[in-house]
Structure formats: C-alpha cells, structure tokens
C-alpha cells in the first residue's frame, strides 16, 4: 500500500514551481527602526534616513497559489493555534513579515517600535480590517454598521456619541452600584454551584451569565435572571448565538464570504442565524428603554445619545449590539484567565488579598473610588492580560502609503498587530512566561507602553475599556474577599483561538471559602 504522503509529493512539487514563478527572493529582517517616509507620512522620532523596500520584499512563510500559507497553518495546528504559529513566525522572519491565508493578505507587526511608528502616523479616522462577514450580514438584512465596521467620518460621528459616556472616568464610576448588584447575586451563584471540592462545572458559561447580566443592567436597566433559578431562555440563546457568530466569521475571513453567501453554506447559515438571534434580543431592550425615558432623556445615557447626537434607531441598534456582544464574551474571558493565573500563583493571590483587606476592612462592598487605592489589583489584571490575553491580535488598514521598518507599505495594506507576541516576548518583558504583577509597579524598570495593548491602540482603542476594567476590578474584590482560588491540578492549559483565546479544557480551579 502506498503512503498518502507519497501521493502528495508531485502536487507539492508542482505548487512550489508555481509559487516560485516571478517571485523575488525574500530576505529575513528583524530591524524595527523606521526610516524617512514620503511627504504625506508624518515623521516620527524613530525614523532615519535611507532607502526602503516595497511590500513584495517582505519575508514570510510559503505562499502557495490560491491557498497562501493555509496548508502550513493547518499542519501547525490549524486556525485554533494560529496565535502560536504567529509567534513562531516572528522568531523566524523577524518583527515584520507578510502572510497570506487564502484570500486574506496581511503584514504582521511584532515590535513596540513598529506599533509606535504606526501610532505616530495615524490619521484622524484610522481604518480597521474590513470584517466582511459582518458587513455581508448587515447588507443582507438591511441593518446599520456599528463601530467595529464603520469607517471615516461616519465612524467618528458614532464613536463621539458613545465616547462622551463610556470613556470618561467620572461617568463610568457612576455605574459601580449596578455592577455590584449583579456581583452580589453572582457570589450566591458560586455558592450554589460549587461541588464538595469547590469546583464549578462549566465555569466559563457561568462567567458569561455574570457578564451578560452586568452589561444588560448597565445598558438597559434590565435583569434576565441568569443568576437566579428562573432563567429567561432568551438570554441563554443570546450567549450561544455570540459564540456561534464568533466561531463562524473567522472561516469566512480566509475564504470569500460572497461565495459562502451565494452557495448558502452551513457556515453562512449559522452565522446569519446567530446575528438574527442577537439583533432579535437587543432591539426590544433598546426600544423599551427609549420609550421609558423619552420624556427625560438626560436621565438615561442611551436616550441621551439617541436624542442629543442624532443617531438613527438603526445606528443605535448596531452600535449597542456590538458593544454588548464584546462585553459579554471578552469580559467573562478576562475574568476566567485571571482566576486561573491567581490559582497557579498563590503568593500573588495572598498579596492581593492583603491589599483588598487593607482598603476594604470587614468585607466591605467595593466602590469605584476604592479601586484607585489598589495598585496591586490593577497590576494583577494587567499582568493577566499580558500573559493570557482574550484577543491575540488586532488590525489596521492603511489609508495612505506608510513607511514601517525598512518597508514602504501601500495604501490599503492590512496590518495585523500581534499584541500577544509583544506580551510574551523576552525582548519586552523579563521572565515573560512568569505571572509577576510586581513588574508593573517597579519604577526603576519602565515598560514600553506599546508592548502592552490589550485594548488596542490609538483612536480605535476599545470604547468599552473603562467599563470592562471596572467590572473586572470589582469582581476580583468580591471573589478574592470570599474565596481562595485553588488549582486542582498542575497540568498546563493550552489556549485555543475561537474568535478569542479560550482554554483547551475545563479550567482546573476551585473556589474554597476563606
């Protein structure tokens, strides 16, 4: 019987010949300095004189016809392990390289100086990667675009409307009572679900319920009962729809979404049904709140945004929907990973407990202003987001020719900013594989701010950052006050990329009452 590998060899040899036709040789580079740009690109302190090369000279993995590097990615674990493969490629090809996955072509950046150079040249309306599956759905259902897919002045107009309420610390601090209301119920839920060893079956699902209840109370002043016995099925369906949407859109980023739509593939059907479910859940909540506060819009931030900033109802639907789905999934994910990291580092957890008790004696309820006096709490969250981020990379699309490193990149180039690579690099963090929150408090060792970007960078930074941080800080205060988070085994837990980074198995942690 012939070996399957032998059958592939003629095909591989043929593809290699096709690949090599007309392609200039690629050289490896690891230089991260930025040279002088054309006139339209503002100079930054990192630029030096010298000639640049074009994008075709960039190093990178094998680029097969039609497939790009998909074969190599699949051999290395598939899209679920692409974050690890990207880290490997940066070690092999340097701090900037080019990779094509099917129809998706991008330039990858993996150094703080390159990201700083990009930030210094950022335009008034920086562009993100075009999320074609999301756009295809909105066009298919005649829905508006939200902040994740809007561009230009339209993006700026909608962003400005929400920014007034979501990016000002004084506005976010007002939400601590609502966040604490949900956390009080969540503590009861933990008590109810713990087994005799303190373990909770499907912890991630329970954290999703907490984050869903929290963001819904903030956005709609509505509770769905997910943390009580009488749970509304609608809420569970919403959470499931988010996970389906996240797991399906990536597949249509590397293969033409137009083809999926035309053939009505199972992926397109699942993606469309998921978005239908999400919008069906959100729209009535927004309508109810707008009606409730129609006579006093200043008393409610959604009504205030709707009436004062002249957004259409469809625009409000789209923006709030994207805000809610991001809050549900990424906030729960971040809390899950920091609990895991604390369970593996009991000395860190003990120091955190001491700080919380010093600020909140007698198990007082934490307030937003209390968090200001907890630098180690903030450092723990930062360190967890560095070591185990929810999102391993973010994107930009260049809206003008830009010089990065030794290369002049044309307008329209898609950039992948590999933020997980930055956080895990020994070049940026000493003992990068260790969970050491103290590093953020050591004044004599300054950390490059462009080496840690869990919420993105520049004008398109995550608009829900301050709200997410407050939710997570308060949640940690509640949980660490009441429970010792214990690791139930010492085996490593791998991270899988399913839209965000999730654990490869149930997290081995237990909640033991103090």
Curated annotation (Swiss-Prot):
SUPFAM superfamilies: Cytochrome P450. Transmembrane segments: none annotated. Residues 1-35 form a transit peptide. The keyword Iron applies. Heme binds at residue 462. Induction: By 1,25-dihydroxyvitamin D(3) in kidney. It comes from the Eukaryota. Its EC number is 1.14.15.16. Keywords: Heme, Iron, Lipid metabolism, Metal-binding, Mitochondrion, Monooxygenase, Oxidoreductase, Transit peptide. InterPro entries: CYP11_CYP27_families, Cyt_P450, Cyt_P450_CS, Cyt_P450_E_grp-I, Cyt_P450_sf. Its main location: mitochondrion. Its cofactor is heme. GO terms for molecular function: 1-alpha,25-dihydroxyvitamin D3 23-hydroxylase activity; 1-alpha,25-dihydroxyvitamin D3 24-hydroxylase activity; 25-hydroxycholecalciferol-23-hydroxylase activity; 25-hydroxycholecalciferol-24-hydroxylase activity; heme binding; iron ion binding; vitamin D 24-hydroxylase activity; vitamin D3 25-hydroxylase activity. It is an enzyme of class 1 (oxidoreductase). CDD domains: CYP24A1. It is found in: Mitochondrion. GO terms for cellular component: mitochondrion. A cytochrome P450 monooxygenase with a key role in vitamin D catabolism and calcium homeostasis. Via C24-oxidation pathway, catalyzes the inactivation of both the vitamin D precursor calcidiol (25-hydroxyvitamin D(3)) and the active hormone calcitriol (1-alpha,25-dihydroxyvitamin D(3)). Belongs to the cytochrome P450 family. This is 1,25-dihydroxyvitamin D(3) 24-hydroxylase, mitochondrial. It comes from Mus musculus (Mouse).
